[in-house]
Amino acid sequence: MINYAPLWKTMEEKHISSYALIEKYGFYKATIQRLRKNQSVNLRTIDDLCQILNCSVEDIVEIVLEPDVPLPRTIRRQP
């Protein structure tokens, strides 16, 4: 599962608000809502956030493994 909790912490540390992302940097409100709901966004959005916040991907997103969720047939976990 994708979790954007690190993004909100990084934004707070860098004194950048959601409002600033929308008004100053041209983010769509819908994109901010997708991030708030931990929904998928494209890599360009992640890259833009990294550039604006001067941070790495790990400062924006974390992957939380869900062991009980079956993987698609195309993805196999190594033992």
Regions found by a protein language model. Give the residues of each.
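Short, charged recognition helix plus adjacent turn
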Residues: 9-10, 62-79
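Alpha-helical residues within the helix-turn-helix
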Residues: 12, 23, 51
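Short alpha-helical DNA-recognition segment
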Residues: 15-33
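Helix-turn-helix DNA-binding elements, focusing on the entry/boundary residues of the two helices
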Residues: 18, 43-46
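The DNA-recognition helices of helix-turn-helix-type DNA-binding domains
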Residues: 28, 39, 64-67
